[in-house]
Swiss-Prot record:
Entries under HAMAP family matching the protein: Ribosomal_uS7_B
UniProt keyword list: Ribonucleoprotein, Ribosomal protein, RNA-binding, rRNA-binding, tRNA-binding
Matches recorded under PROSITE patterns: RIBOSOMAL_S7
GO annotation (BP), single: translation
GO cellular component: small ribosomal subunit
Organism lineage string: Bacteria, Pseudomonadati, Pseudomonadota, Alphaproteobacteria, Rickettsiales
Subunit text: Part of the 30S ribosomal subunit. Contacts proteins S9 and S11.
Protein name: Small ribosomal subunit protein uS7
Lineage: superkingdom: Bacteria
GO MF terms, alphabetically ordered: rRNA binding; structural constituent of ribosome; tRNA binding
Protein family according to the UniProt entry: Belongs to the universal ribosomal protein uS7 family.
CDD domains with a match to the protein in the record: uS7_Bacteria (cd14869)
Its biological purpose: One of the primary rRNA binding proteins, it binds directly to 16S rRNA where it nucleates assembly of the head domain of the 30S subunit. Is located at the subunit interface close to the decoding center, probably blocks exit of the E-site tRNA.
Length: 160
C-alpha cells in the first residue's frame, strides 16, 4: 500500500428533499448493499416521525443531533521508542461528522424499538437534546482524550 498518494475527496451531491450534503452523507452511511432508495426511505420517514411526534423542525433536529454528537478530540495511537501511547488529537470537521453519523447509526440499531425508522427517530431526537447512547460515546471519547492529556507532546506527524 503506497503512502504517497492521497485519495481525492469525492463530491457528494446534496439530498433531494432538504438540499443538504450532511444529510446525504448520513443517508449513504445508512445504506446497505447499494440500496439507496431504502436508506432514503428510512431517513426521511424517521425525520417525518420526529416532526409528527415532537412537533419540531426535523431538519433542525437532525443538525442539532449531529452537532451535539460530533467529537472535538479523539485519541490516536502513536509508537514512540517501543511503546504505544494514546495521544489526544483534534478532530477535523469532516471526520467529526463522519464519526457522529456512525455513532448515531450504531446507537439507533442497538435500540429496542422494532423498526429502524423508530429507532433512528428516537436516537436523533435524544441526541438533539444531549441524551442517548451516541452522546455517551462522544463523552467517553472526550474522557479518554482528557485522561491521556499527559501524552499530548507526542503529537502525530499529521499534526506537525
Amino acid at each position: 500500500m503506497s503512502r504517497r498518494h492521497v485519495a481525492e475527496k469525492r463530491i457528494i451531491l446534496p439530498d433531494m428533499k432538504y438540499n443538504s450534503i450532511l444529510l446525504s452523507r448520513f443517508i449513504n452511511n445508512i445504506m446497505k448493499a447499494g440500496k439507496k432508495a431504502v436508506a432514503e426511505k428510512i431517513v426521511y420517514s424517521a425525520l417525518n416521525k420526529i416532526e409528527k411526534k415532537h412537533s419540531v423542525d426535523p431538519y433542525q433536529t437532525f443538525n442539532n443531533a449531529m452537532h451535539n454528537v460530533k467529537p472535538h478530540l479523539e485519541v490516536t495511537s502513536v509508537r514512540v521508542g517501543g511503546a504505544n501511547y494514546q495521544v489526544p488529537t483534534h478532530v477535523d470537521e469532516r471526520r467529526g461528522y463522519a464519526l457522529a453519523s456512525r455513532w448515531i447509526i450504531n446507537a439507533a440499531s442497538k435500540r429496542s424499538e422494532k423498526m429502524m425508522i423508530d429507532k433512528l427517530a428516537e436516537e436523533l431526537f435524544e441526541a438533539s437534546n444531549n441524551r442517548g447512547v451516541a452522546i455517551k460515546k462522544k463523552e467517553d471519547t472526550h474522557k479518554m482524550a482528557e485522561a491521556n492529556k499527559a501524552f499530548s507532546h507526542f503529537s502525530p506527524k499529521k499534526m506537525k
